[in-house]
């Protein structure tokens, strides 16, 4: 397993140096290291401007929640972080979007490598029509040079990390589509982390799940922040307050306010933020 961990660690350390982690979230708030830097960012779909001159720093190894009413630009921004909007013909952007020293928007950026470094978990679980094992092994087979034994170890490690190993260990070669919704979503998280990403993007990861599965995913998100930088879009105010370290509130394509989650929810600086978190609109 040492060789396997070294292989994954080497990939995760590309373009940045290892940084000691704080012992507690409170310490991390003092001088958080920036993982994602967004400056003067604008985005369009055709002639419609979805994001207006947005600037935001996303700290490393924390959970940052994007909140705001539908159409406010939060999912658009999330999808630009790993260039998912490249597949939208009318999508265009301008500004600065950096992950460490990587210029995400540069035409020379290797998008395949970018999406390995920046994993994505979608609103609806989307396992491949393959076995549970093959879902997790798919990415590593493309990006890593592993023996079968190392691949087996990585699949187990990823499923354990995603808190689903005990539920699937005796049926790894069964169809992934036979899992429950909550299990499928945790499988998708395992699939995302199997290639050693630095960042995990989550777009409404619990909206299609029952309360018990939602709680399991929320607990998992909070644990994963120790190793990954997580950016989560959610319409669920309680969820944002429970499992994020920082919150950014968007309205009509603009960033209204961002800061420690407790501050945004209990002592917001902007009236629109206060109205939104209190449920006066949305």
Curated annotation (Swiss-Prot):
GO terms for cellular component: plasma membrane. It is found in: Cell inner membrane. GO terms for biological process: phosphate ion transmembrane transport. InterPro entries: AAA+_ATPase, ABC_transporter-like_ATP-bd, ABC_transporter-like_CS, P-loop_NTPase, PstB-like. It catalyses: phosphate(out) + ATP + H2O = ADP + 2 phosphate(in) + H(+). Residues 1-25 have a biased composition (Polar residues). Its EC number is 7.3.2.1. It is a peripheral membrane protein. SMART domains: AAA (SM00382). It comes from the Bacteria. Keywords: ATP-binding, Cell inner membrane, Cell membrane, Membrane, Nucleotide-binding, Phosphate transport, Translocase, Transport. The keyword Transcription regulation does not apply. Residues 36-277 form the ABC transporter domain. GO terms for molecular function: ATP binding; ATP hydrolysis activity; ATPase-coupled phosphate ion transmembrane transporter activity. ATP binds at residues 68-75. Its main location: membrane. NCBIfam families: 3a0107s01c2. The complex is composed of two ATP-binding proteins (PstB), two transmembrane proteins (PstC and PstA) and a solute-binding protein (PstS). Part of the ABC transporter complex PstSACB involved in phosphate import. Responsible for energy coupling to the transport system. This is Phosphate import ATP-binding protein PstB.
């Amino acid at each position: 397993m040492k060789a396997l961990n070294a292989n994954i660690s080497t990939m995760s350390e590309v373009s940045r140096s290892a940084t000691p982690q704080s012992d507690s979230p409170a310490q991390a708030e003092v001088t958080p290291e920036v993982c994602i830097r967004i400056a003067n960012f604008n985005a369009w779909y055709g002639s419609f401007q979805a994001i207006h001159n947005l600037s935001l720093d996303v700290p490393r190894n924390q959970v940052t929640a994007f909140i705001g009413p539908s159409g406010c630009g939060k999912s658009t921004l999330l999808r630009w972080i790993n260039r998912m909007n490249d597949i939208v013909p009318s999508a265009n952007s301008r500004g600065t979007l950096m992950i460490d020293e990587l210029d995400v928007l540069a035409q020379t950026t290797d998008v395949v490598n970018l999406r390995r470094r920046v994993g994505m978990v979608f609103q609806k679980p989307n396992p491949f029509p393959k076995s549970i094992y093959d879902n997790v092994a798919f990415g590593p087979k493309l990006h890593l040079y592993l023996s079968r034994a190392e691949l087996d170890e990585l699949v187990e490690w990823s499923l354990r990390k995603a808190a689903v190993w005990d539920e699937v260990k005796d049926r790894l070669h069964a169809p992934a589509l036979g899992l429950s919704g909550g299990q499928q979503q945790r499988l998708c998280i395992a699939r995302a982390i199997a290639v050693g990403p630095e960042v995990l993007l989550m777009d409404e990861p619990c909206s299609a799940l029952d309360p018990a599965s939602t709680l399991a995913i929320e607990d998992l998100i909070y644990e994963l922040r120790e190793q990954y930088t997580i950016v989560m879009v959610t319409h669920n105010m309680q969820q944002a307050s429970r499992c994020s370290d920082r919150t950014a509130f968007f309205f009509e394509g603009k960033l209204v306010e961002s800061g420690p989650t407790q501050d945004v929810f209990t002592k917001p600086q902007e009236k629109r933020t206060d109205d939104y978190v209190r449920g006066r609109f949305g």
